[in-house]
Amino acid sequence: MKKIIIVSIAKEKKIKDFRLVITPSGRSRIGAIQTKDYGIIAYPDKKDFEKIGEMINWAFNESDDKVIEYSSDIKIEKRFYNCNSYRKVTNDYNMIFFELIEGIYSISLLKKDGDAFVALEDENKEAVECIFPEKPTALELGTKVMEMFEYKERYDGLIE
């Protein structure tokens, strides 16, 4: 099995006083990537790039390939987002994945597609992502993640 680590980073679609939800991952019993039952819910200053990067790095360090033996019965949309359906999460949040796949670190910007998130493509039909030559510092990671969220907010017309 390939070594794959994924950290989910969700930002509420608000310019001020937004919620940031950062969750580590493990494996389900059948080997699929699964969100762990804990994470970070924060209301950071959007310019505090290093602190945002540190929170993402914490979740990255918590992520692994171990099987999650005991999982909460509380649905993820209620547990982390205080929403009553995952559709509300896809409507109210933008999502980025920070990934490590076979030694390559990258972040991928996602978009809503029905009731799920899929890779966002730019005007050239290329995925909006950033590949790092090595593990990024907290400052680099936080800066790039917030730049990508800003790009998505412009794409959605939330900011000009």
What does each model-identified segment do?
Residues M1-K47, I101-T143:
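Intrinsically disordered, low-complexity regulatory segments enriched in Ser/Thr/Pro
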Residues V21, V89, I96, S108, ...:
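Generic signature of intrinsically disordered, low-complexity segments enriched in small/polar residues
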Residues A42-N94:
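Negatively charged, low-complexity tracts enriched in Asp/Glu with abundant Ser/Thr
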Residues F18, F49, F60, F80, ...:
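Phenylalanine-focused residue identity feature
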Residues Y43-K66, N124-E160:
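Ampiphathic alpha-helical segments that act as solvent-exposed interaction surfaces
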Residues R19, R27-R29, R79, R87, ...:
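Arginine residue identity/basic-tract feature
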